[in-house]
């Protein structure tokens, strides 16, 4: 097999592979000889079938197997020999030629691929981040406990007009342009006024009604409503009030906690505090991770494989369009254009690919591994999301290596972040809950803003790096 490099520009490689006709002939003869002693054909004794007859019967199919074997094995062996790592599976271009199948020509094909870039991991011990910590107040625990115990609250029917906090039982029929719509009908629906269970403006118009009342209320579905064909539409609901019930006194005591399966009110408070602390901890963790990624992003600006960027962008873009479709919104509603959005998300894809490569390299040098038990836990978490389909989901993961890889990647990334947290400088800072949540909600906008700033400042440097990498042999 003769291997000739035909392109070496930056990370791009093109390789021409030529397998001489005589080598193909030798491999074909091996298969024919192996088959000769095994095959049984009428009119021939075992092992006595002439090679010429076997060639006539099976020559082309055997040669096709030989070619497929070469195509499957060659990319891996070539990359090993060249000490290169391909960013994605190499593209194989084959010039189909009947003469090759007939054993009358050399087999020539081309490999096209991008190599993973080589770069040095910089010292990250000087990275300094701020760990924001929000304490859980007694008031917050009280409010959450009250909210939880409200689900156990009893109500008593009465004749008085409804007030906020009362529970009404209603039938309703919704119409748009005087035509009923799917999902707009309900019978014996219980609704606590002020719970914001329904769209804005709906519950407010039921304050003051009595049992037996009928009422038509006009509302407008929010522009970002989850059902696209209803988003932004005006609707009229014809309401029949069946009962109005006043809330009984809410008891916050051990007996109320026992209704939830807990031994005491103190235990309920412990559970609630733990849940809130876990929620805030996840937010803190996400902000810590963002700071680490921002620091790493500022330190690296090497060329990255275009194909990896394309794959990442396509994933981001599909999610963006799916979110827009579900909300019934457009790019114009988000104060941008599709062209501008594509540019921004393409830069975001570049950032994520580069950071992914940096984290991968750090993890490899630190010998970070994802254990089988960690992977199994992740698989079981996925299975739990599809009750009744456990067997099918498990089989899916068994036969889909890509799905396993998609589960392994975020686990590996989080373990690398854990590793970095033990080697960087961390300064704790007390913040309010509002400060913690406000900045957390703005994180995506912050990330895209950082991408723009970095891209603007690095354009010249990036061009210089590309010129240098074109000359470099990897």
From Swiss-Prot:
UniProt keyword terms in alphabetical order: Cell cycle, Cell division, Chaperone, Cytoplasm, Isomerase, Rotamase
Residue intervals of the PPIase FKBP-type domain: 165-250
Skewed-composition ranges (Basic and acidic residues): 451-467
Top-level EC class as recorded in UniProt: isomerase
Main location: cytoplasm
Entry GO MF terms: peptidyl-prolyl cis-trans isomerase activity; protein folding chaperone; ribosome binding
SUPFAM superfamilies: FKBP-like (SSF54534), Triger factor/SurA peptide-binding domain-like (SSF109998), Trigger factor ribosome-binding domain (SSF102735)
EC numbers on record: 5.2.1.8
InterPro entries given in the database record: PPIase_dom_sf, PPIase_FKBP_dom, Trig_fac, Trigger_fac_C, Trigger_fac_C_sf, Trigger_fac_ribosome-bd_bac, Trigger_fac_ribosome-bd_sf, Trigger_fact/SurA_dom_sf
Top-rank lineage group of the source organism: Bacteria
Subcellular location: Cytoplasm
Region named Disordered: 451-474
GO cellular component annotations of the record: cytoplasm
Listed GO biological process terms: 'de novo' cotranslational protein folding; cell division; chaperone-mediated protein folding; protein transport; protein unfolding
Catalytic reactions on record: [protein]-peptidylproline (omega=180) = [protein]-peptidylproline (omega=0)
Similarity section: Belongs to the FKBP-type PPIase family. Tig subfamily.
Its job: Involved in protein export. Acts as a chaperone by maintaining the newly synthesized protein in an open conformation. Functions as a peptidyl-prolyl cis-trans isomerase.
Family annotation (NCBIfam families): tig
Domain topic, free-text comment: Consists of 3 domains; the N-terminus binds the ribosome, the middle domain has PPIase activity, while the C-terminus has intrinsic chaperone activity on its own.
Protein name: Trigger factor
Higher taxonomy: Bacteria, Pseudomonadati, Pseudomonadota, Alphaproteobacteria, Hyphomicrobiales
């Amino acid at each position: 097999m003769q291997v000739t490099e035909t392109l070496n520009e930056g990370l791009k490689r093109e390789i021409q592979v030529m397998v001489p006709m005589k080598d193909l002939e030798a491999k074909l003869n091996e298969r024919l000889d192996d088959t000769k002693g095994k095959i049984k054909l009428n009119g021939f004794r075992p092992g006595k079938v002439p090679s010429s007859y076997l060639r006539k019967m099976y020559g082309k199919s055997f040669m096709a197997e030989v070619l497929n074997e070469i195509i499957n094995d060659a990319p891996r062996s070539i990359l090993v020999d060249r000490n290169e790592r391909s960013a994605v599976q190499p593209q194989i271009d084959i010039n189909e030629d009947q003469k090759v199948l007939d054993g009358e020509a050399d087999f020539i094909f081309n490999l096209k691929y991008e190599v993973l870039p080589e770069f040095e991991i910089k010292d990250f011990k000087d990275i300094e981040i701020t760990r924001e910590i929000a304490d859980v107040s007694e008031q917050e625990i009280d409010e959450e406990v009250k909210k939880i115990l409200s689900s156990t609250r009893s109500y008593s029917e009465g004749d008085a007009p409804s007030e906020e906090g009362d529970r009404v039982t209603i039938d309703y029929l919704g119409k748009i342009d005087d035509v009923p719509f799917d999902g707009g009908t309900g019978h014996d629906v219980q609704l606590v006024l002020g719970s914001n269970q329904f769209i804005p403006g709906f519950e407010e118009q039921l304050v003051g009604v009595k049992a037996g009342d009928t009422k038509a209320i006009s509302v407008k579905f929010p522009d970002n409503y989850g059902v696209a064909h209803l988003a932004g539409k005006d609707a009229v609901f014809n309401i029949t009030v069946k009962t109005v019930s006043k809330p009984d006194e809410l008891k916050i005591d051990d007996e109320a906690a026992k209704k939830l399966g807990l031994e005491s009110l103190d235990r309920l408070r412990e559970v609630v505090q733990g849940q809130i602390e876990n929620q805030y901890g996840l937010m803190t963790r996400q902000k810590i991770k963002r700071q680490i990624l921002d620091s790493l992003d500022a330190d690296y600006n090497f060329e990255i494989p275009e194909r990896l960027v394309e794959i990442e962008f396509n994933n981001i873009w599909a999610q963006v369009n799916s979110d827009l479709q579900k909300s019934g919104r457009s790019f114009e509603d988000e104060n941008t254009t599709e062209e501008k959005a594509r540019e921004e998300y393409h830069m975001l894809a570049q950032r994520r690919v580069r950071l992914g490569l940096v984290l991968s390299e750090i993890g490899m040098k630190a010998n970070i591994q994802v254990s089988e038990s960690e992977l199994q836990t992740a698989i079981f978490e996925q299975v739990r999301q599809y009750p009744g389909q456990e067997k099918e989901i498990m089989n899916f993961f068994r036969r889909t290596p890509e799905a396993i890889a998609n589960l392994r990647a975020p686990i590996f990334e989080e373990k690398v972040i854990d590793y970095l947290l033990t080697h960087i400088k961390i300064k704790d800072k007390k913040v309010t809950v509002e400060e913690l949540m406000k900045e957390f909600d703005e994180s995506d906008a912050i990330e895209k803003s950082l991408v723009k700033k970095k891209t603007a400042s690095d354009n010249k440097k990036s061009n210089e790096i590309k010129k240098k990498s074109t000359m470099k042999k990897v």
